[in-house]
Amino acid sequence: MSRTKQTASKALGGKAPRKGISAKSIPSSGCSPAMPKRTRFKAGALALKEIRKYQKSTDLLIRKRPFQRMVRDLCKGREGVRFQASAIVAFQEAVENFLTSLMEDAYRCVLHAKRVTLMPKDICLVYKIKYANILYAALD
C-alpha cells in the first residue's frame, strides 16, 4: 500500500460515518442468522397498554416491603407501636385508594385546562378543593 499525504482539516464534530459491511464478512451460506426482530410500538401505545393492565388488576401497586418500611420508619419515634401484617395491608389499600382518586381528579383538572400533561399545580388544586376542610381543621 502506498502512503498518501493528508492535509489538516477542521473537525466538525458529530458522529463518525458508518463503515459499510464488506462482502467478505457476510457468510456465504445464504441464510441470515435468526435474530428476532423487535417490534416498534407507536408513541404512547405502551403507556396505554400499561394503564389498561393496571386498571384490570386488583393487586397492590406499591410493593409491600418498601411500604412497610416507610410506615415503620414514620412511627419510629413512638414507643411501643406495633403493627399486624393485616393492618399494614389494609393501610396500604387505603393509601393506594386515596392516591388513585387524587390522580383521577387531578387528571380531570388537566382535561379541563385543555392540556395533556399532569402538572404539580393540578394536584395542588385538587388537594385544596377536596381536602381544604381537613387541612384547616387540623390547624385549629
Swiss-Prot record:
SMART domains found in the cross-reference section: H3
Matching CDD domains: HFD_H3
Region feature (Disordered): 1-36
Keyword Transport set for record: no
Post-translational modification, as annotated: Mono-, di- and trimethylated to form H3K4me1/2/3. H3K4me activates gene expression by regulating transcription elongation and plays a role in telomere length maintenance. H3K4me enrichment correlates with transcription levels, and occurs in a 5' to 3' gradient with H3K4me3 enrichment at the 5'-end of genes, shifting to H3K4me2 and then H3K4me1. Acetylation of histone H3 leads to transcriptional activation.
Keyword Acetylation: yes
One GO CC term, this protein: nucleosome
Any GO molecular function: protein heterodimerization activity
Modified positions (N6,N6-dimethyllysine) in chain numbering: 5, 15
Cross-referenced InterPro entries: Histone-fold (IPR009072), Histone_H2A/H2B/H3 (IPR007125), Histone_H3/CENP-A (IPR000164)
Modified sites of kind N6-methyllysine: 5, 10, 19, 24
Modified residues annotated as N6-acetyllysine in this record: 10, 15, 19, 24, 56, 64
Protein location: Nucleus; Chromosome
Chief place of localization: nucleus
S-S pairs: none
Keyword field: Acetylation, Chromosome, DNA-binding, Methylation, Nucleosome core, Nucleus
Modified residues (N6,N6,N6-trimethyllysine): 5
Family: Belongs to the histone H3 family.
Subunit structure as annotated in this protein's UniProt entry: The nucleosome is a histone octamer containing two molecules each of H2A, H2B, H3 and H4 assembled in one H3-H4 heterotetramer and two H2A-H2B heterodimers. The octamer wraps approximately 147 bp of DNA.
Function: Core component of nucleosome. Nucleosomes wrap and compact DNA into chromatin, limiting DNA accessibility to the cellular machineries which require DNA as a template. Histones thereby play a central role in transcription regulation, DNA repair, DNA replication and chromosomal stability. DNA accessibility is regulated via a complex set of post-translational modifications of histones, also called histone code, and nucleosome remodeling.
Protein's recorded name: Histone H3-like protein
